[in-house]
Amino acid sequence: SRYGGLKQLDGLGPNGETIMDYSIFDAIKAGFGKIVFIIRKDFENDFREKILNKYEGHIPAELCFQSIDALPEGFTCPEGREKPWGTNHAVLMAKDVVNEPFCVINCDDFYNRDAFQVIGKFLSELPEDSKNAYAMVGFRVGNTLSENGTVARGICSTDEAGNLTTVVERTEIMRVNGPVCYKDE
């Protein structure tokens, strides 16, 4: 990666807090009561030592593993693939431990407490028999750019009622002399 390491484990706060620690703190303050971490198996020992151990006894936490060959029946991993499948696949890996309304984040992005409060409110107001109810907290792409290179983002469009209509993956997004630009594939 451009970063050159596992930024999920690198401390940046005054007491070594990670970006993930700030998100977990904000999520707990917003009313979330359980954490499910989805990681690669080869990352387990470091993750338990640096992250999971600090939450034991404070909030229920589960650990699931994402593997590129863990696929639904009828699917196979293309030969030579090394890169993880992504967020949807990670969520699939947690299907046996998530039985309640939930929120998904990436642990190397900072969201802020307001984001957790918004999604927490949505989830807490769902009727008990709710199925297939979804929401997302969106951010203006210009507020998510890096000063250290390009980023990839899902660019969302909505209808007049605020319903999500499309998500288009854009790569190599950056600011060029003011405006936000991306590579047109």
Per-region residue spans from a language model:
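Short glycine-enriched, charge-decorated loop/helix-capping segments at active-site entrances
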Residues: 6-13, 77-81, 151
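Short beta-strand-to-loop acidic/aromatic patch adjacent to the donor-nucleotide binding site
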Residues: 100-110
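Residue-level signal for inorganic ion chemistry
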Residues: 20, 94, 108, 140
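Conserved core of the sugar-phosphate nucleotidyltransferase
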Residues: 113-185
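N-terminal glycine-rich phosphate-binding loop and ensuing alpha1 helix
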Residues: 1-52, 59-61
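Short, electropositive alpha-helical surface patch
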Residues: 46-58, 116-125
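Structural beta-sheet core signal
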Residues: 37, 63, 104, 136-137
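Short phosphate-binding loop-to-helix
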Residues: 55-101
